[in-house]
Regions:
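Switch II (G3) loop of P-loop NTPases
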Residues: 176
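Catalytic-core "active-site belt" of small-molecule-metabolizing enzymes
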Residues: 1-171, 179-204
């Protein structure tokens, strides 16, 4: 199982991080399976970063083997969605960007991919028009809608499958909207999809 993630997929988030360049193709990076955090287990802040940020995202679960998938058929290759957190060591990310180095160590560290309970796609009328949000200690800190994605889910799947074979159980983190920020020990994070709580855990 692998975790495929999309960077810079919401215009306002790109602006808040100072990215003004318009990408013609999705920005893709990978996380190892050891990044998965699930079942409400706590997230432990690592000792190599002083600035861990939350990034709330819609996560798509792949359910078929696929290669060179046409966009019009991409919806056949996933069966469920949830809310996830792409934890990012922002201080390391800034350093790596300055050095021109890859993102893996600031994005793919252990437990950096928190996922909630998956819901069958049939539960929703249109997954390309879903609202999701994150609460920290009961206060909303981030909200987004999949309609605002720069690259849509089916197009991302088609694009990635040109380079990497998709396998059953792979996860696709589809990008984060505006409103990212730091986490600290003791906080409770709750993620919602269409006002249904799917993710609930603590920072330790």
């Amino acid at each position: 199982m692998k975790i495929i993630a999309v960077g810079m997929n919401y215009a306002l988030h790109n602006k808040e991080l100072g990215h003004t360049h318009e990408n013609k193709e999705p920005v893709i990076f990978l996380k190892p399976d050891s990044a998965i955090l699930k079942d409400g287990k706590p997230f432990f802040i690592p000792d190599f970063s002083n600035e861990i940020h939350y990034e709330t995202e819609l996560v798509v679960r792949i359910n078929r083997l696929g290669k060179n998938i046409a966009p019009r058929f991409a919806n056949r290759y996933y069966d469920a969605v949830t809310v996830g957190i792409d934890f990012t060591a922002r201080d390391l990310q800034r350093k790596f960007r300055e050095q021109g180095n890859p993102w893996e160590l600031c994005k793919g560290f252990d437990s950096s991919a928190a996922i909630g309970t998956f819901v069958p796609v049939e539960h929703y009328k249109d997954i390309q028009n879903l609202n999701f949000n994150l609460l920290i200690d009961g206060k909303e800190v981030q909200r987004g809608c999949t309609a605002d994605m720069l690259f849509k889910i089916d197009d991302i799947i088609a694009y990635v499958s040109r380079f990497v074979t998709l396998k059953i159980g792979d996860l696709l983190f589809t990008g984060t909207p505006v409103g990212v920020g730091p986490v600290s020990i003791g906080q409770r994070l709750q993620g919602y999809l269409e006002e249904e709580k799917l993710l609930d855990f603590y920072i330790r």
